[in-house]
Amino acid sequence: MVRSPVSDKFCIPDTLASWPYPRILNPHYAEEKAASAAWTKGFGAFGPKAQDAFDRCDFNLLACLAYPIATPERCRSGCDLMNLFFVIDEHSDTHGEETVRKMKDVVMDAIRNPHKPRPNDEWIGGEIARQFWERAMCYASEISQRRFIDTFDEYLESVVDQAADRDSARIRDIESYINIRRNTIGAKPSFVIMEQGMDIPDNVFENEVFQRLRMATIDMLCLGNDIVSYNIEQARGDDSHNIVRIVMNELDTDVPRAMDWVAQRHTQLEREFFTALSELPTWGEPIDGWVKEYVYGLGNWVRANDQWSFESQRYFGTKGMEIMKSRWLSVLPKVRPAEVGPQLVDQSLL
């Protein structure tokens, strides 16, 4: 394929231009953000500069956009989970497979034994996970507790696989990348927060149409996250786990054409989502009511993830809303992070 001349700017496709789910913020955002942010900061997982950048990312906003109808208790569970995810993400990104495997073992032991105090000399992620789950499980049905533990284990195993890829400098092909990304995105355990007060039976949950809805949602989340995070990831030399880099590598193309590929794939996924939605069976009440609320949550998650990406300072500093309108970005120069944790975006370069 003939490449376009290298440009210092590129455009992020507006993948949700026709997405019918509107932005809705949980009314308990302010109080639950304050509680969860203070709780997270108290663990001292990052140095001062990284903690400041972490706070500006406002992962509590992501939770409160993703769970707009959640009770205060479940809203807090969502906030704590998002903060836990990104503590794990930031720490695991700087280590190889062996260390990340140990991190996974610590976290899963904490999740499976939430009332057991963690050793003082252990990686702090274990205690964060333990406290999160000890509080969150109180508001979760037994079946949703099981699903959370199973899916969180899958998520962490994929993070280990990602570390193994880093160790070997592996660049996956599109198909195998999407397979691992469906787990590293953390969507499956995130969806469990939506069903904490539900008892959706396994036969309903495993229904083929229901699973198609979930898969289309997860894939849209993966693509949506990767297109907004690509710029800072390429700048930090950490873009090997990003669909833009994967498409560029496999199709021997450039950033604009890779973004076009993502946009076309996203449109296809939207069609798959609404086709599955129209084919969803009925099971009678109360199951149909639970399923309706859950499916609304899936569609809303897609909007929430996109909104947070621009409203927070995670990817674009304070220029997020401006970039959300213009869609244009300047390619950030390469930079090596000075410490573990998120880094402030130099928005003067965007």
From Swiss-Prot:
Its EC number is 4.2.3.-, 4.2.3.135, 4.2.3.198. Mg(2+) 2 binds at residue 89. InterPro entries: Isoprenoid_synthase_dom_sf, Terpene_cyclase-like_2. The record marks 86 as: Plays a critical role in the stabilization of intermediate cation. Mg(2+) 3 binds at residues 225, 229, 233. This is Delta(6)-protoilludene synthase STEHIDRAFT_64702. Terpene cyclase that catalyzes the cyclization of farnesyl diphosphate (FPP) to delta(6)-protoilludene. In presence of Ca(2+), a significant switch from 1,11 to a dual 1,11/1,10 cyclization occurs, producing beta-elemene as the major product, with lower levels of delta(6)-protoilludene and (E)-beta-caryophyllene, and traces of beta-selinene and alpha-selinene. It is an enzyme of class 4 (lyase). (2E,6E)-farnesyl diphosphate binds at residues 314-315. Belongs to the terpene synthase family. A motif (D(D/E)XX(D/E) motif) lies at residues 89-93. Keywords: Calcium, Cobalt, Lyase, Magnesium, Manganese, Metal-binding, Nickel. Its cofactor is Mg(2+); Mn(2+); Ca(2+); Ni(2+). The 2 conserved active-site motifs D(D/E)XX(D/E) and NSE are required for coordinating the divalent metal ions that stabilize the PPi moiety of the substrate. Mg(2+) and Mn(2+) are more tightly associated with the active site motifs (D(D/E)XX(D/E) and NSE) and thus lead to more efficient removal of PPi. Mg(2+) 1 binds at residue 89. Pfam families: Terpene_syn_C_2.
